[in-house]
From Swiss-Prot:
Family stated for the protein in its record: Belongs to the bacterial ribosomal protein bL9 family.
A Pfam family this chain is assigned to: Ribosomal_L9_N
Gene Ontology cellular-component annotations: chloroplast; ribonucleoprotein complex; ribosome
Main location: plastid
Protein name in UniProt: Large ribosomal subunit protein bL9c
Cross-referenced HAMAP family: Ribosomal_bL9 (MF_00503)
Keywords assigned: Chloroplast, Plastid, Ribonucleoprotein, Ribosomal protein, RNA-binding, rRNA-binding
Function, as annotated: Binds to the 23S rRNA.
Keyword Cell membrane carried by entry: no
Entry's localization field: Plastid, Chloroplast
GO MF, one example: rRNA binding
A GO BP annotation: translation
Length: 155
């Protein structure tokens, strides 16, 4: 006896099946007895499939738009290339505390008016005066490399 298969639209992410709003083929019994009663999916009608195509096209346009913005931000940051921050120093070139992602994000915002989430900034441990390479993840496969000049704070 062969399995009967039905198309459903997922309403939430289901491991090993798909993500929310995906159209997937599942066994009729699985859909009728588990997915639909638990409001995890609904039967894919012609209208729903058309709506899914429209949703996918809009999502694709948003991704393209976000990637273009990320590339523009990358160009802007790499044109400036070097950002500076002043920190209080102790003995020699050692600074008090360290430079954080939040501080770098604030410097970039003040300089370029571009808001970058601190979680997307990858920095080495900065404890001394000097020049450091910073990597900023802007989008999938779009990163900007900048330099951060840590200077002693003048009194």
């Amino acid at each position: 006896m062969s399995k009967k298969i039905i198309q459903v639209v997922l309403k939430e992410n289901i491991q090993k099946l798909g993500k929310s709003n995906d159209v997937v083929k599942v066994a009729t019994g699985y859909a009728r007895n588990f997915l639909i009663p638990n409001k995890m999916a609904s039967v894919a009608t012609v209208g729903m499939l058309n709506q899914q195509k429209l949703y996918a096209a809009i999502k694709e346009k948003k991704i393209i738009f976000a990637k273009e913005n990320a590339r523009k931000t990358q160009q802007l940051l790499e044109e400036i290339q070097k950002f500076s921050i002043s920190k209080k120093t102790g003995d020699g070139e050692t600074i008090f505390g360290s430079v954080t992602e939040k501080e770098i994000s604030q410097i970039i915002k003040n300089t370029t008016n571009v808001d970058i989430d601190k979680q997307n900034i990858l920095i080495p441990e900065i404890k001394t005066i000097g020049l450091y390479n910073i990597e900023i993840k802007l989008f999938n496969q779009v990163t900007a490399n900048i330099q951060l000049q840590v200077l002693p704070e003048s009194n």
